[in-house]
């Protein structure tokens, strides 16, 4: 991916640092239990992703749960998140805009859009003296990080994902991300699961890779 576009003069959007791994197959109950050490909210939703030309991979567009149009701009990668022996993934910098979208009747998916069903468990953390602690969402702009464990259904196939998304002041995004990952990975994942860079990608990159595999 390549960074794209300058800041909009109208709005800065929401800046974030993110790491995500997406793996094939059903989510194992033991992994859900490992994640369940922390309080989490669970929701099911269906997002629809616009399938763009690979050259525009740094500009993903989706309709979130039929209620909001979201546009993200990739701002580059500041490096690798590494928890020795447990996880290694690409840190990605993003800027996101969200626009309300009225719900439509019917469940048809226009050409060029790919529906993705998600059952999401989301645990939220805030920073306290440089350490991550479980917390409810604070006021907008405060440093924090969401950890997300998601069961994915797409085109009749099962996948699962673990991701972290840090938001708040730009200077604290990296601290929030790494502190939350350190807390989450303080315990080994069940079954010796190790998350590697080969599975570390955004939803847009994953969808493009799946499409390439189908047409190979």
Where are these regions (language model features)?
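Gly/Pro-rich, tryptophan- and cysteine-flecked surface segments typical
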Residues: 137-138, 150-151, 208
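Mixed-charge, glycine-accented linear interaction segment located at domain edges/termini
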Residues: 156-209, 213
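Acidic, contiguous internal or C-terminal segments within carbohydrate-active enzymes
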Residues: 19, 141-170
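Charged surface patches that recognize polyanionic ligands
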Residues: 7-14, 22-144
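Hydrophobic, proline/glycine-rich low-complexity stretches
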Residues: 1-18, 211-216
